């Protein structure tokens, strides 16, 4: 699966297209086929190593971008508020990998249903 990320801390010149494993949702997670992302100042700070002391990511590569929208393609066993096919948007926790990938997994508590005209 393709993603956009980096293999060392630095500026935007470190970004590259990565080949990463396609994630599977855990019990309280959904898998989302990502259709859009945004890059904001927090992402750039993370890229420069600004959250290194507190992040849960211990190895490279790191996928960029917190904000996303897309469609649920798989759900974990304990997900009740969403179903496959739902259009959603959300924000990945800054301490974990981001959303600049073809598919991501995320806890159901970090997403919302997208408006009908979305």
Give the residues covered by each predicted segment.
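Extreme N-terminal starter segment of soluble prokaryotic enzymes
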Residues: 1-2
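Short beta-strand-to-turn element immediately C-terminal to the catalytic PLP-Schiff-base lysine
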Residues: 6, 47, 73-74, 105-106
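Short N-terminal binding/cap micro-motifs at the start of the first secondary-structure element
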Residues: 10-15, 41-42
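Residues that act as N-cap/strand-start positions at coil-to-secondary-structure junctions
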Residues: 14-19, 98
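Conserved hydrophobic/aromatic beta-strand scaffold that supports enzyme active sites
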Residues: 17-22, 69-71, 103-105, 111
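Glycine-rich beta-strand-centered segment in the early N-terminal region that forms part
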Residues: 21-38, 51-95
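Cytochrome P450 core scaffold surrounding the K-helix E-X-X-R motif
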Residues: 42-48
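NAD(P)H dinucleotide-binding glycine-rich loop of Rossmann-like/cofactor-binding domains
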Residues: 81, 91-118
């Amino acid at each position: 699966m393709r993603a956009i990320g980096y293999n060392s801390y630095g500026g935007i010149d470190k970004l590259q297209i990565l080949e990463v494993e396609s994630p599977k949702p855990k019990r309280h997670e959904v898998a989302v086929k990502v259709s859009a992302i945004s890059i904001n100042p927090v992402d750039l700070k993370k890229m420069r190593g600004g959250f290194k002391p507190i992040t849960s990511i211990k190895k490279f590569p790191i996928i960029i971008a917190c904000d996303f929208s897309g469609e649920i393609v798989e759900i974990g066993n304990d997900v009740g508020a969403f179903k496959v096919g739902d259009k959603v948007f959300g924000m990945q926790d800054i301490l974990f990998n981001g959303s600049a990938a073809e598919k991501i997994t995320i806890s159901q508590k970090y997403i919302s249903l997208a408006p009908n005209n979305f």
